[in-house]
């Protein structure tokens, strides 16, 4: 009893929701054995006959090829294609293929030579001694793909399964009407199919191997049972006929009771499924060493005189196969590649046979009925009841029609297997599968565009990050390469900072002078003497380096004297307006006096060392002397009228007096050394004398009209008087040194006499004013 229950549980099957029972129409083609078809004159081999990218071409136009020779290289998920016969490559160009869009794809066109010569074949009869990776690579390089309709590369599928596969399922259901390719293959080649199953089991090492076959194939079932009579590792499961029990998810649930998760794969639950035709192709690739160059194709339909199953070479035009089967087309003949529910209508008959071509259906006008007009959905829910994937086709229809991609995705449109059960039961004749296919294509295009945008954004962000890193590295290099100050520069900087700190410390100590006491100026005097010594040393260095040819310009000296007078006036005015509360710093006064004395000595020494190369113009000297005398008279008058209330700073007066004395000595020395070599033009002298008289008259008039309220600075007057005396002495010396050959101009003498008279009058007037 326990063994009976165990056997019952072992052979138990489950049923899925939905499904339909359309007319099978399989008896038209499953009664005749497989047969060969004569070779076509031309073969068109598309480079992409599988899910994934097309391979890389390894032939060119004009090449001679043999049957089984690779036309492309298979790398990664790229599956190679092989020459179906021997011949010559005449073209490599786009050609329409078996696709609902009828778009052209790159194809290799071969003209057959009729010899059908194979490449050297190397079979692995001892495949059990081969490593798993070697077998998978051989299957992949021999171009084996899923022949049940998906076209997924078998080698990639086996590689992805790895060691987690517990159940290997062989799909022999072949549930769609009209199609009998797998049925006939199992009847005629059952032993080869089982051998291919054993190779797959050797690669995957599953715990159990299940063959699922519908009960409408009695001959195939009997042939498989005969082959599996002595095998205990492979179980044959006969399931009820129901469409679409051949779907991967549906058959997995029927045989194991496990459901593939949404968005997942069967390998996630430890299940891997392969088709009967794929198992046969694996056997031929591994044991016989033959790449996939042909497959079984069902030729059926009332428009075909000799329906049946044939071995069709890949790349054979559909027209060639139909004509060989006695095709009798009508006026509006339709040819479907695949079954009536999941197949596609061919745009023309030059489309080639590919790896996923399992049936060519040529129905008559009465066989499928007249096409019905599409009507509005009445929401009868018949499509939802028939859906084997538990979807809501009516809702997906509305979302697809309204371009509501997000809602269609939310309602799991990706789980639709496009079986056509919903369209079969729809009373409104709505081609639901067409809407779903279009919606899936649009969603795939949107996701592809989003992926490109994300990749572009990632590249942009990576570029920005790289630029930022390069910028930071560049700045770091610049910082590290910056020139550091030398040791001597650091010492100089440190010394300067020390001096500044010392001065700041001295400035922060207030100087307090008590009444009746004299401050202790010993430190100040010592510092002053040190500075004086330093200044003398610097002056000696400068004198040694200066060129002996340096000439002192008396005009520059006069300008400097004028600038000194202006500064003196400004300081006196500021001191006069200053508040009496301001204290006088004795240290600063001493420093200024020392600086003035040093400048005076410097000027005297420069005057002594200057060479007398510069020539002095006696005419200019005469004019300057006259101007100086006029300014002296003006200053004397201003001093007489000056108010006695203005205070005088003795320090500044001493400084200015010292500077004036030095400048006067310099002028006297220059005048003494000047050579009167330049001849005097009597006309220029007359002009200058006239100008001097005019200036003298203007000065007398200004003095007469001057207001007595104007205050005169006695210090400035003293300085200017000293300068005037120096200039007068200079003029006298120049006149004394003049050569006797120079003629005396009577006009010049007259001018001088006039100037003397004016000066005498002015002196008398000033004397009277002073006495008053």
UniProtKB/Swiss-Prot annotation:
It is a peripheral membrane protein. One of its GO terms (cellular component) is plasma membrane. Residues 369-397, 407-436 form the 4Fe-4S ferredoxin-type domain. Binds 2 [4Fe-4S] clusters per subunit. It is found in: Cell inner membrane. [4Fe-4S] cluster 1 binds at residues 377, 380, 383, 426. It holds the Pfam family Fer4_7. It is an enzyme of class 7 (translocase). The keyword Cell inner membrane applies. Keywords: 4Fe-4S, Cell inner membrane, Cell membrane, Electron transport, Iron, Iron-sulfur, Membrane, Metal-binding, Repeat, Translocase, Transport. Its EC number is 7.-.-.-. It comes from the Bacteria. Part of a membrane-bound complex that couples electron transfer with translocation of ions across the membrane. Required to maintain the reduced state of SoxR. Belongs to the 4Fe4S bacterial-type ferredoxin family. RnfC subfamily. This is Ion-translocating oxidoreductase complex subunit C. The lineage of its organism: Bacteria, Pseudomonadati, Pseudomonadota, Gammaproteobacteria, Enterobacterales. The gene is rsxC.
């Amino acid at each position: 009893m326990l063994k009976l229950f165990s056997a019952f549980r072992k052979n138990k099957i489950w049923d899925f929701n939905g499904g339909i029972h359309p007319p099978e129409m399989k008896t038209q083609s499953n009664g005749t054995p497989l047969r060969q078809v004569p070779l076509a004159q031309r073969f068109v081999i598309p480079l992409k006959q599988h899910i994934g990218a097309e391979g890389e071409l390894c032939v060119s136009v004009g090449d001679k090829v043999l049957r089984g020779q690779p036309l492309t290289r298979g790398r990664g998920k790229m599956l190679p294609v092989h020459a179906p016969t021997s011949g010559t490559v005449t073209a490599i160009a786009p050609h329409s293929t078996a696709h609902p869009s009828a778009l052209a794809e790159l194809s290799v066109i071969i003209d057959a030579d009729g010899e059908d010569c194979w490449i050297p074949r190397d079979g692995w009869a001892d495949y059990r001694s081969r490593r798993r990776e070697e077998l998978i690579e051989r299957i992949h390089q021999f171009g084996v793909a899923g022949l049940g309709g998906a076209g997924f590369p078998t080698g990639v599928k086996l590689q992805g399964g790895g060691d987690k596969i517990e159940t290997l399922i062989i799909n022999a259901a072949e549930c769609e009407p009209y199609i009998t390719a797998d049925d006939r293959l199992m009847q005629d080649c059952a032993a080869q199919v089982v051998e291919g199953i054993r190779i797959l089991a050797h690669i995957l090492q599953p715990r159990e191997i299940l063959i699922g076959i519908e009960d409408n194939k009695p001959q195939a079932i009997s042939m498989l049972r005969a082959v599996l009579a002595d095998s205990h590792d492979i179980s044959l499961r006969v399931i009820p006929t129901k469409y679409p029990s051949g779907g991967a998810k549906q058959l997995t649930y029927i045989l194991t009771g496990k459901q593939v998760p949404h968005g997942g794969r069967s390998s996630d639950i430890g299940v891997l499924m392969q088709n009967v035709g794929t198992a046969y192709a694996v056997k031929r690739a591994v044991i016989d060493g033959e790449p996939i160059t042909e497959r079984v194709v069902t030729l059926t339909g009332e428009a075909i005189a000799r329906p049946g199953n044939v071995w069709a070479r890949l790349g054979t035009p559909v027209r060639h196969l139909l004509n060989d089967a006695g095709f009798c087309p009508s006026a509006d003949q339709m040819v479907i590649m695949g079954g009536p529910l999941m197949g596609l209508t061919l745009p023309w008959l030059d489309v080639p046979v590919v790896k996923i071509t399992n049936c060519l259906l040529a129905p008559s006008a009465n066989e499928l009925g007249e096409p019905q007009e599409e009507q509005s959905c009445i929401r009868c829910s018949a499509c939802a009841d028939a859906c084997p994937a538990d979807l809501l086709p009516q809702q997906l229809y509305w979302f697809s029609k309204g371009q509501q991609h997000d809602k269609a995705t939310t309602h799991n449109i990706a789980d639709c297997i496009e079986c056509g059960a919903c369209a079969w039961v729809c009373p409104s004749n709505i081609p639901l599968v067409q809407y779903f296919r279009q919606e899936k294509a649009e969603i795939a295009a949107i996701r592809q565009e989003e992926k490109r945008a994300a990749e572009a954004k990632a590249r942009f962000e990576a570029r920005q990050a790289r630029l930022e890193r390069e910028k930071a590295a560049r700045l770091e290099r610049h910082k590290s390469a910056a020139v550091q100050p030398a040791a001597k520069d650091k010492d100089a900087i440190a010394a300067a900072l020390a001096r500044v700190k010392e001065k700041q410390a001295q400035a922060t100590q207030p100087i307090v002078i008590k009444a009746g006491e004299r401050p202790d100026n010993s430190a100040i005097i010592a510092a002053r003497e040190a500075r004086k010594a330093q200044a003398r040393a610097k002056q000696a260095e400068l004198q040694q380096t200066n060129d002996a040819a340096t000439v002192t310009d008396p005009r520059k000296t006069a300008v400097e004297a004028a600038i000194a007078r202006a500064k003196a006036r400004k300081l006196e005015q500021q001191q006069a307006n200053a508040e009496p509360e301001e204290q006088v710093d004795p240290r600063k006064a001493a420093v200024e006096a020392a600086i003035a004395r040093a400048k005076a000595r410097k000027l005297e020494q420069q005057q002594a060392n200057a060479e007398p190369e510069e020539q002095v113009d006696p005419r200019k000297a005469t004019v300057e002397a006259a101007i100086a005398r006029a300014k002296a008279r003006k200053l004397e008058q201003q001093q007489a009228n000056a108010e006695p209330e203005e205070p005088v700073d003795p320090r500044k007066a001493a400084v200015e007096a010292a500077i004036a004395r030095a400048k006067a000595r310099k002028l006297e020395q220059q005048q003494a050394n000047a050579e009167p070599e330049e001849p005097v033009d009597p006309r220029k002298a007359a002009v200058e004398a006239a100008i001097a008289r005019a200036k003298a008259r203007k000065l007398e008039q200004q003095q007469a009209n001057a207001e007595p309220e104007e205050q005169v600075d006695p210090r400035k007057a003293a300085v200017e008087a000293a300068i005037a005396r120096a200039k007068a002495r200079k003029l006298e010396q120049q006149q004394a040194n003049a050569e006797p050959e120079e003629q005396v101009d009577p006009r010049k003498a007259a001018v001088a006499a006039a100037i003397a008279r004016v000066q005498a009058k002015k002196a008398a007037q000033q004397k009277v004013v002073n006495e008053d």
